[in-house]
Amino acid sequence: MDRGARANIRAVLTGETRSRWALVLGASSGFGEACSIALAKAGWNVFGVHLDRKSTQPNADRIVAEIAAAGRKAEFFNVNAADDAKRSEVVAAISRSCSGDSPECRVSVMLHSLAFGTLKPFFGEPRENAISKQQLEMTIDVMGNSLVYWTQDLFFAGLLAPGARIFAMTSAGDHIVWPAYGAVSAAKAVLEAHVRQLAVELAPHRVSVNALRAGVTDTPALRKIPGNEQMIERVQAMHPAGRLTTPADVAGALVALCADGAAWVSGNVIGVDGGEDIAGGR
């Protein structure tokens, strides 16, 4: 057992981590799922926000059970993370939970991993197949602007811990063109701009903000992109390591960036792709 693992076990046994909470937006699948479980194993309790129908709710329940099995607490909210009223309700619930925990209870890690948007070309035939103004604005708001809204609400509610780490999931679509990905690509560019601005404005509070650019990963979100099977085949053929990125790869990187020694890493887009991007793209 390495020194870090022993230190974490000591912290759990002595109660040092009892007030450490992470907030994961998009907690029930893909990157959000993997990061929720990894953070729990590293000593964080988890607030999870997800949007699931009855058919997919069992997976969210399984994640909660895995967090509990790691000896951590989990509070999951099945709501639309992009809805202003629902966001306020979740923040209020977090505040109530923290008030009953300890005076030190704050959110010390936040992950923005929302993958809800419109995948349509700008110029479709017929015109009805082209993306609309409403769809474009919705995609950018959900996948980009909501990072700011959630961070603001936590900050002004006094729930963002000094020294907190904020992460946002981006993709190579921020600089590579994929069919029907234009709105999401725009949202990722907006998201990365917000990461830079938040990093500067929150620096006096010792809060770091970074975007994680994952390589092509076989997630439910990827499966919605037109041509995803061909994309997977191309990446597997050209990747220097011969495989796709996995959610576990991203979760491991996120937990590593939560270490004390990584506090000075802020305002960056960090590639978590095993060299995929530099090896020739997609």
Regions flagged by a language model, labelled:
Residues 208-218, 258, 271-273:
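Conserved SDR Rossmann-fold cofactor-binding beta-strand/turn motif
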Residues 2-10, 255, 266-282:
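Short C-terminal tail/terminal secondary-structure segment
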Residues 59-61, 180-183, 204, 211, ...:
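A glycine/serine/threonine-rich, flexible loop-to-helix segment
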Residues 203, 208, 265-267:
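Short, small/polar-rich loop/turn modules that mediate ligand/substrate recognition or access, typified
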Residues 86-89, 138-141, 145-153, 196, ...:
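Conserved mid-core alpha-helix of short-chain dehydrogenase/reductase
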Residues 115-204, 216-217, 278:
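Catalytic loop of short-chain dehydrogenase/reductase
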Residues 239-250, 261:
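A conserved structural motif in NAD(P)-dependent oxidoreductases
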